[in-house]
């Protein structure tokens, strides 16, 4: 199992190119199941979760390849299997997104109950109830969610019980080929939903309101091919901005969009960072200063993103002052805090709230990554700590950060990947 060895006390500065958003690329890849013609996708990151998704699509009969430019070419015209099997699905919760397009286009589909990050309850109930309201018959048997419908799904008004990015995407995908009009109320508003809707509309869907809490989909009989470029990854962008903020550095994030990161940029400025934005870049300069502690409360978009909570927890661990972090989206998402405490951080956890007391310096040690965003916060902590830090279970990072050690080295980090068996 691979690990990272990180040598600390680096000031992280330089320029970094931001990859395409994993959280947009995944639903878009599954949405390609709906198309009767080939699709070309650019700016798709090279990640473990992306490769798993391509393998699931291939299992269904989709022709899925990358060309010499890195573009992903998909042809779902000859799908002949309708099951996403456990051996592929077990590592990734996003695989539930295969179900909606299969049922919408082929009137049947089954997906193994998925796996993924271990950060609390992320039930698929909202996906299932949404599809049922569109007319699908769904049963859970032998670890599989099995769905079928005798004819086309039928549009209706759906109020999502709790704001859910995943369920919003499932319902939106399914409704594109339903009879009549579907209205989604209490829809999630994330930029990745907007990007998926843009992709579906390029294929001939009729979706309006994406990015608001009220999405309308007029069903069409078929979707055709198109070309689409995946939006930049706002969470990767925020992560590299944090890298500069915690180390007193200056980082320029290229090929990204500031308008998807308002809540994060506001908090970075509150922490004392100088942040400048252009149409396609964001520059953060700490001018060599230590950050100030900032209170964080996660919320659905356009609120503060839960996927940036771990990175800001690290910032608060080394900031001047005391801060309160409240996690409202996922339970059990403070697993990075005990590891940061092992590095000399000071914090107390009570329920969904953490109180961080900033310290001047962290110390390198061995830590264990528990999920995608927690793991990157530990790597960044190693970059600024004294001595050497070993980060174990970095397969979590490979699920969501493209070429992470190369990008960090480009900013001056001293980091190397090694196999656990090579440690001696």
Curated annotation (Swiss-Prot):
Pathway: Cell wall biogenesis; peptidoglycan biosynthesis
Positions contributing to UDP-N-acetyl-alpha-D-glucosamine binding: 93, 122-126, 162-165, 307, 329
GO MF annotations, alphabetized: UDP-N-acetylglucosamine 1-carboxyvinyltransferase activity
Post-translational modification 2-(S-cysteinyl)pyruvic acid O-phosphothioketal, affected residues: 117
UniProt-listed InterPro entries: Enolpyruvate_Tfrase_dom (IPR001986), Enolpyruvate_Tfrase_sf (IPR036968), MurA_subfamily (IPR050068), RNA3'P_cycl/enolpyr_Trfase_a/b (IPR013792), UDP_GlcNAc_COvinyl_MurA (IPR005750)
Pfam family, any one: EPSP_synthase
GO cellular component, one term: cytoplasm
Compartment list: Cytoplasm
Catalytic activity: phosphoenolpyruvate + UDP-N-acetyl-alpha-D-glucosamine = UDP-N-acetyl-3-O-(1-carboxyvinyl)-alpha-D-glucosamine + phosphate
Amino-acid positions noted as binding phosphoenolpyruvate in the UniProt annotation, renumbered to this chain: 22-23
EC number(s) recorded for this UniProt protein: 2.5.1.7
Active site: 117
Gene Ontology biological process terms, A to Z: cell division; cell wall organization; peptidoglycan biosynthetic process; regulation of cell shape; UDP-N-acetylgalactosamine biosynthetic process
Keyword terms of this UniProt record: Cell cycle, Cell division, Cell shape, Cell wall biogenesis/degradation, Cytoplasm, Peptidoglycan synthesis, Pyruvate, Transferase
Chief subcellular location: cytoplasm
Function noted in UniProt: Cell wall formation. Adds enolpyruvyl to UDP-N-acetylglucosamine.
Family per record: Belongs to the EPSP synthase family. MurA subfamily.
PANTHER family according to UniProt: UDP-N-ACETYLGLUCOSAMINE 1-CARBOXYVINYLTRANSFERASE (PTHR43783:SF1)
Protein's name according to its UniProt entry: UDP-N-acetylglucosamine 1-carboxyvinyltransferase
Species lineage: Bacteria, Pseudomonadati, Pseudomonadota, Gammaproteobacteria, Pasteurellales
């Amino acid at each position: 199992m691979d690990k990272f060895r990180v040598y600390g006390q680096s000031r992280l500065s330089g320029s970094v190119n931001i990859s395409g958003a994993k959280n947009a690329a995944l639903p878009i890849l599954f949405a390609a199941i709906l198309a009767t013609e080939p699709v070309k996708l650019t700016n798709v990151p090279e990640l473990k979760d992306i490769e798993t998704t391509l393998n699931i699509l291939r299992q269904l009969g989709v022709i899925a390849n990358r060309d010499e430019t890195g573009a992903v070419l998909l042809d779902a015209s000859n799908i002949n299997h309708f099951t996403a099997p456990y051996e592929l699905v077990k590592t990734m919760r996003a695989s539930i997104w295969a179900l909606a397009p299969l049922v919408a286009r082929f009137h049947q589909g089954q997906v193994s109950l998925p796996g993924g990050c271990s950060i609390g309850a992320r039930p698929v109930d909202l996906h299932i109830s949404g599809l049922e309201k569109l007319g699908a018959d769904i049963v859970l048997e032998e670890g599989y969610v099995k769905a079928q419908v005798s004819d086309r799904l039928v549009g209706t008004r759906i109020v999502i019980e709790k704001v859910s990015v995943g369920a919003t995407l499932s319902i939106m995908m399914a409704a594109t080929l339903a009879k009549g009009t579907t209205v989604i109320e209490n829809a999630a508003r994330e930029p990745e939903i907007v990007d998926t809707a843009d992709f579906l509309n390029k294929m001939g869907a009729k979706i309006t309101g994406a990015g608001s809490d009220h999405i309308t989909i007029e069903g069409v009989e078929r979707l055709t091919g198109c070309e689409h470029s995946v939006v930049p990854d706002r969470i990767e962008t925020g992560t590299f901005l944090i890298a500069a903020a915690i180390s007193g550095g200056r980082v320029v994030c290229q090929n990204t969009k500031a308008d998807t990161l308002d809540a994060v940029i506001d908090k970075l400025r509150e922490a004392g960072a100088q942040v400048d934005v252009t149409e396609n870049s964001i520059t953060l300069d700490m001018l060599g200063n230590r950050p100030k502690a900032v209170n964080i409360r996660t919320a659905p978009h356009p609120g503060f993103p839960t996927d940036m909570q771990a990175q800001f927890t690290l910032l608060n661990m080394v900031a001047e002052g005391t801060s309160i972090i409240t996690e409202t989206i996922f339970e059990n998402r403070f697993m990075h805090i005990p590891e940061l405490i092992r590095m000399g951080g000071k914090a107390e956890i009570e329920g969904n709230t953490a109180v961080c007391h900033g310290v001047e310096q962290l110390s390198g040690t061995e830590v264990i990554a528990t999920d995608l965003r927690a793991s990157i916060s530990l790597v960044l902590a190693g970059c600024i700590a004294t001595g050497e830090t070993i980060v174990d279970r970095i397969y979590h990072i490979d699920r969501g950060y493209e070429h992470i050690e190369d990008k960090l080295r480009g900013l001056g980090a001293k980091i190397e990947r090694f196999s656990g068996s090579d440690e001696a």
